[in-house]
Amino acid sequence: MLATVGIGVQGVAKLLVTVVVGRVFGTETLGQTTALLSLSVFVALLWPNAAGNTASRFLAIALRGRRSDAAVNRLLGVSMLVSSVVLAAVTVPIALAWGNGPGMVLGGAAVVVGYGLYCYARGAQLGYDRAPRVALWDSVTSVLALGLLVVACVARLEPFVLLPLAIGYTVFAIACWPRGNGFPPASHEPAAGVLGFAAWNVLAVVTSNGLLQLTMISAQVTSSAHDAGVYAAAFTLATPASMLGQALGQVLVPAFAHRTDGGSLRSRGALLLVVGFAAASAVVFGLVALLAGWFLPIVYPAEGAAAVADLRYLMVAVWVFTVGLVPAALLLAAGRSRQVALASVAGFVVGAGLMAVLGPVAGVAGGTTGFLVGSAVNLVAVVGLGVRRRSRSAIPDSID
């Protein structure tokens, strides 16, 4: 529960950042900022997010088995540092191609590094069952980021509006970086399966979570700067809702790491969890869509009225996407990252293909349509995996 609160605080902080940016610096800057944030989240899926999920599972197993996790920490830590440099370097030419100035490019690269380290450190702390620590530092760094944003706005430092978030994420990573579980290291600490699990997890999280970020990136690429800014107003209010499923997924991976049912939805508890979450989130998301015409113009006076239809359509797609994260997390907890990845590929390919085809023709609605259809395919695929009887001889994708 505390971990969910923590990620909710971070989501609210990110929302407030975009609201302030939109109000102070205008529609086009809002679009650029939101697109760069989506890019940072997307590239984090290419390793840091998967490394965090891997740390969450393997550190939890080592802790409960009273074994040292030094080898796992060392392996994942080095991989994180290398990937941070590579992903930041990849971000720079993309940000420049979108017409951003040096300050925004620097901020975008800094967010890529900071957010990636944040994802890894957060997953590791949840593996240690330290949800209170995670919630504390989520809150502290959110306040820090908002305070620094106020300074940037007062000083009219428009090119550097992303740096406050980058600093907040980096401070969290430093404070929560995994430093071991305290058990004495053995002469040989097995880390077999760690990178293999993480590699399949990359494919799993990209194909299941990547479409959401590609929706905003598609708007930035296929629409005018003004239309992308209007869509960003809807996107920034829709994405915090998806964090419910992401937060629950991060909690489920370590909590269910020792279950022997392979993430099956045939068990009563797992089925009730998925159905209950789907029903509860439908109520929440439905209220957001229903009240959009009232609160959007208040939050974004310049863009709100024009973004109402975009938000309502997005909420349908985000709900389908969010529900699919829960059965996927149960499968990941059982070590079935390979199956989740392969099951999600079809949805990602269909969704991304529709974005590419419909984006230039239908504008921002084309991106949302691709996201909705791709998420629906993913949901059907992971539910099918969870319901299907698993062979007794099947083994997890990694060895503890």
Each language-model region and where it sits:
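Interfacial segments at transmembrane-helix termini and the short loops linking adjacent helices
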Residues: 27, 94-108, 290-322
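Hydrophobic alpha-helical transmembrane segments
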Residues: 105-109, 114, 135-183, 348-350, ...
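Membrane-interface junctions at transmembrane-helix termini in multi-pass inner-membrane proteins
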Residues: 114-136, 316-343
